[in-house]
């Protein structure tokens, strides 16, 4: 294979497909938990996993693996955040099924969000705005903009970690599963939209246009 062939540009995933890959596993998790008994009656192999939350965990792991595989096939790369999240899903999902203890899958968002928050805020201590490596393809900001956005996202991830702990320890499993889809996602979308003024203010593309 020639050098030119080896360096073919990567295919960018469309925003719609990216949304499906990110939300798809969560929707599978929600559906499988709410319809666990029905799935168990239709597919005996799933019944062997245990109750609805365990069936949901197994299918969540499968859906997450599928999303990562599709992303790799399309782009020949795996984004850092989905990859880390996927690894934690597989580890904590396996523990959940093996020990028949749903505490592990419930703590997965806490671990992932704490890890992301610590990485982002910890990077700033070494003068690195690591969020830039995640969003660099989407937009370009000046150094001060990346620093401020990194702080905000770092704190937000830690907030989500604390929120997850409160919800799963204080409410039922069904409520927690529903909150993952219909609570956490809207909160994240609203937070993302709230960052637009900061992004516009520090956008280098805007400065170039001027």
Curated annotation (Swiss-Prot):
Any one Gene Ontology cellular component term annotated for this protein: plasma membrane
Localisation per UniProt entry: Cell inner membrane
Gene from which this protein is expressed: yciB
Superkingdom of the organism of origin: Bacteria
Protein name: Inner membrane-spanning protein YciB
Transmembrane stretches, start-end: 19-39, 53-73, 78-98, 115-135, 148-168, 175-195
Statement: the UniProt record of this protein carries the keyword Chloroplast: no
Membrane topology note: Multi-pass membrane protein
Function: Plays a role in cell envelope biogenesis, maintenance of cell envelope integrity and membrane homeostasis.
Source species of the chain: Sinorhizobium fredii (strain NBRC 101917 / NGR234)
Protein keywords: Cell inner membrane, Cell membrane, Membrane, Transmembrane, Transmembrane helix
Pfam family, one: IspA
Family: Belongs to the YciB family.
Taxon lineage: Bacteria, Pseudomonadati, Pseudomonadota, Alphaproteobacteria, Hyphomicrobiales
Database matches in PANTHER family: INNER MEMBRANE-SPANNING PROTEIN YCIB, INTRACELLULAR SEPTATION PROTEIN A-RELATED
Disulfide bonds: none
């Amino acid at each position: 294979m020639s050098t030119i062939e080896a360096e073919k540009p990567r295919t960018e995933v469309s925003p719609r497909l990216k949304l499906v890959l990110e939300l798809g596993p969560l929707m599978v998790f929600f559906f499988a938990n709410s319809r666990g008994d029905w799935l168990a009656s239709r597919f005996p192999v799933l019944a062997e996993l245990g109750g609805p939350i365990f069936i949901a965990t197994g299918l969540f792991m499968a859906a997450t693996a599928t999303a990562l595989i599709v992303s790799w096939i399309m782009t020949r790369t795996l984004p850092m955040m989905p990859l880390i999240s996927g690894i934690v899903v597989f580890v904590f999902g396996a523990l959940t099924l093996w020990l028949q203890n749903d505490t592990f899958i419930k703590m997965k968002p806490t671990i992932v969000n704490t890890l992301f928050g610590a990485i982002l805020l910890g990077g700033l201590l070494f003068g690195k705005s690591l969020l830039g490596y995640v969003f660099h393809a989407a937009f370009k900001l000046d150094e001060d903009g990346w620093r401020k956005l990194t702080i905000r996202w770092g704190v937000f991830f830690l907030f989500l970690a604390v929120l997850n702990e409160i919800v799963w320890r204080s409410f039922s499993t069904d409520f927690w599963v529903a909150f993952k889809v219909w609570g956490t996602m809207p909160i994240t979308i609203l937070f993302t939209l709230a960052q637009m003024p900061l992004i516009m203010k520090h956008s280098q593309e805007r400065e170039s246009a001027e």
